[in-house]
Amino acid sequence: MIRQPRPAKRLLHHLMALDRTDQTVQIEEIPVACPRLPAAFHGARVAVVADVHFPDALLSIPALVDCVAIQNPGAIFLPGDLTNSYTFFDEVRLAKLAKALSAIAPCYAVAGNHEMRLGREKRYGAILERNGIHYLSDSYADWTMKGETIRLFGAARKRPTPLAVDGQPSVVITHKPDRFHYYCRARWELVVCGHAHGGQMRLGEHSLYAPGQGFFPTYSGGVYTADNTVMVVSRGLGNSSIPWRVSNRPHLPVLILQPKL
């Protein structure tokens, strides 16, 4: 008589098989409308590198850098959690990644909750700055293309202050998507963030769990719009406290900026 695997064991094997297939990076091109976009930025590409979580990244540094480089980005946004507070502060890998990415395109970064939890936010920022990345902590930097400029803000405060520059779109890099209603109230036009890890396990557009949102989160990955605010949420490139990603491949969004869609 042939024994059939028990249902629980079959489910476990199925989840493990899915988990193994989820290690390849999904590169997702996302057209984004910015109505006041300067002409030099029409069609500009922005790679979003979020939630790498060294030393628990799902890709090696060369593999990740290659994925970004072939997208030919005009800029790279890093919305936090390049490190993992549950293991250790991996300064060596952080510096290597920062140096390699800054050689591709101008890079703009904020801290995530893992950097803040470690109490290493200043150290994190110093490593990034030393290796060519603009570190934004409730501050801004200018991204220039062909003589025209967009001011980029990095937001770390829980309740953001409305920010605007006359004649320019308000573009903000921050970490947490669960503050979307604050971002809308601040009238930010484009917000780029991570943190939710795609909800860990996905079934179509539905996901299981995200930090700060709990089970069945609203903002786990993709594009969200309300009023005049567009928020793009990366599903991230690494693992943290929950080691499995099921039907949830590592995610490299590439924003394609347009004046309208």
Task: Describe the function of each predicted region.
Residues 1-46:
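Acidic, histidine-bearing metal-coordination/catalytic regions of metal-dependent phosphoesterases
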Residues 15-20, 210, 240-243:
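Short, P/G- and charge-enriched loop/turn segments at secondary-structure junctions
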Residues 33-37, 62-71, 183-184:
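Short amphipathic alpha-helices and their capping/turn segments at secondary-structure boundaries
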Residues 34-39, 54, 84, 113-190, ...:
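Conserved catalytic scaffold of divalent metal-dependent phosphoesterases
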Residues 45, 72-75, 106, 149, ...:
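Residues at the starts of beta-strands that form the adenosine-phosphate
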Residues 45-48, 76-78, 109, 172, ...:
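Residue-level marker for buried hydrophobic side chains located in beta-strands
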Residues 51:
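Conserved acidic
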Residues 54, 58-143:
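Core catalytic region of metal-dependent phosphoesterases/phosphodiesterases
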